[in-house]
């Protein structure tokens, strides 16, 4: 019998407990940056996943079912639903090892995070935006021009791909990372 040429390729599996804890903590923390707070239900579901009682897919199914069974009418509850769904999606993305550093991946991640929450999830906006950020004490963030977003994305990704971190001191790496402009581009905001 001939050797299976695909045997060396292993199907990605659930990460270990520590990595799951990191993924959920990061996901919830990223929501807090936008002033969103997850529900107790999400926290309990995340703990079940971290402890290995349910898979990441099962956690997402539980979160989705939870909101299908109890339609939301209040704006605070809508934001909690967003926090829960996006947190579970961030945790899933952080648990995956597959990744391509490209504009298409960036847009795809946006679509995965906000699908079913914002109608323009994963689409490059065709209008200019501004937003006052509480993390900047109310200062307005300057976002890229809608007419140039695709070109700006491609340029920024190429610049980052060409940058070498080899041999740099940690503070220089942090300084460079602080100048990466992807958040300024902001694919879509509803």
PLM-predicted stretches and their roles:
Residues 1-189:
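FIC/Doc superfamily catalytic core
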């Amino acid at each position: 019998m001939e050797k299976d040429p695909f045997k060396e390729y292993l199907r990605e599996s659930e990460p270990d407990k520590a990595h799951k804890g990191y993924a959920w903590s990061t996901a919830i923390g990223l929501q807090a940056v936008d002033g969103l707070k997850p529900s107790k239900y999400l926290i309990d579901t995340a703990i079940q996943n971290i402890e290995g009682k349910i898979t990441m897919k099962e956690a997402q199914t539980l979160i989705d079912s939870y909101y299908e069974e109890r339609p939301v009418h209040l704006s605070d509850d809508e934001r909690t639903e967003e926090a829960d769904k996006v947190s579970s999606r961030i945790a899933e993305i952080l648990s995956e090892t597959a990744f391509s550093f490209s504009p298409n991946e960036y847009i795809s991640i946006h679509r995965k995070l906000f699908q079913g929450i914002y109608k323009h999830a994963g689409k490059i906006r065709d209008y200019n935006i501004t937003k006052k950020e509480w993390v900047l004490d109310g200062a307005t963030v300057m976002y890229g021009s809608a007419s140039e977003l695709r070109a700006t994305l491609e340029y920024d990704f190429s610049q980052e791909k060409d940058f070498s971190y080899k041999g740099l001191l940690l503070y220089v790496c942090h300084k460079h990372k602080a100048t990466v402009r992807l958040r300024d581009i902001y694919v879509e905001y509803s």
